[in-house]
Regions:
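Aromatic- and histidine-enriched alpha-helix N-cap/loop-to-helix transition segments
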Residues: 8, 95-99, 245, 249-252
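Helix-loop elements that line ligand-binding/catalytic pockets
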Residues: 198-200, 204-208, 212-260
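Alpha-helical recognition segments enriched in aromatics with Gly/Pro capping
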Residues: 10-221
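Divalent metal-dependent hydrolysis catalytic cores, especially in the metallo-beta-lactamase
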Residues: 1-6
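Single conserved hydrophobic/aromatic residue that forms the stacking wall/gate
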Residues: 261-270
Length: 270
């Protein structure tokens, strides 16, 4: 139920940066504070990028005052037009990686169980979060001492195209809900594995609607049947979902149940 705002955790961010400087993982230069990437040997483990790939794929600015091209900003100076806070390095603001690490530590404690995000955030954002967190209060030799599990979701496209306001193809849940029940919308979204992309089209939502209706039909026809009446080869939903939250696999099994429902006895469906 916590929805932290970055501006409410500036002291925690400054505290994190000070600790990194004291432990020689970061340095101050021209009003900036930067994390020195070569000091953290596990950098790149999450994204599985080598040194050259890290530099090529990094979004960080290559400034002349950096000790290393891969070094990223923890704190940067603010102009009069930009938001800023007093700090040991002058008036400035935190880098966005710093914000996430500080708020996670303060609100959840370390380590926390699951860290989610889009797959585009694996590098450099999540890689940087791990580095600065493991070099402070978490364990430097154990990347999972910050977050135990990382879940990166794919993107939703529309009929093969990127969903974007500029293309005018944005579909809002509230609009879908005018024609489809929430269960149908959720099932449609779960039809693709969370790590993969989902191409949204009418076929996806129609298939989900059809499956939901069929499952309710089966349920209504099985009312009054006790557990002992049911097939011993029950659907093991938990085991399927334990396999990296394999929702498409579970939906496949639900479809198989619907096929079995056409057998002479509805009991055979379970």
């Amino acid at each position: 139920d916590i929805q932290p705002k970055a501006t409410e955790y500036i002291p925690e961010m400054i505290e994190l940066i000070v600790e990194l400087i004291e432990k020689d993982f970061a340095y101050e230069k021209e009003g900036h504070v930067l994390f020195h990437v070569p000091t953290y040997q596990n950098y790149g483990k999450l994204s599985k990028r080598n040194r050259d790939e890290q530099i090529a794929g990094s979004r960080v600015e290559v400034a002349p005052f950096k000790k290393d091209p891969a070094d990223f900003v923890l704190w940067k100076p603010s102009t009069d037009e930009q938001p800023g806070w007093e700090s040991p390095w002058g008036v400035g603001r935190p880098g966005w990686h710093t914000e996430c690490s500080a708020m996670s530590k303060k609100t959840l404690g370390l380590p926390f169980d699951i860290h989610g995000g889009g797959r585009d955030l694996i590098f450099p954002h999540h890689e940087n979060e791990i580095a600065q967190s493991c070099c402070t209060s978490a364990s430097i030799d154990e990347p999972d001492s910050y977050a135990k599990y990382w879940m990166h979701n794919g993107f939703v496209t529309i009929n093969g195209e990127k969903m974007a306001k500029s293309l005018g193809n944005i579909i809002l849940v509230k609009d879908l809900a005018e024609n489809y029940h929430g269960e149908v919308i959720r099932l449609a979204l779960l039809s693709s594995h969370y790590r993969q992309g989902l191409d949204w089209n009418e076929k996806v939502i129609h298939q989900a609607n059809k499956l939901i209706n069929k499952l309710y039909e089966i349920k209504d026809n099985l009312d009054g049947i006790t557990i002992s009446d049911k097939n011993e080869n029950n659907l093991d939903a938990i085991s399927i979902l334990m396999d990296d939250l394999n929702t498409p696999g579970l939906i496949t099994e639900l479809n198989n149940i619907c096929l079995l429902y056409t057998s002479p006895s509805p009991r055979d469906a379970l």
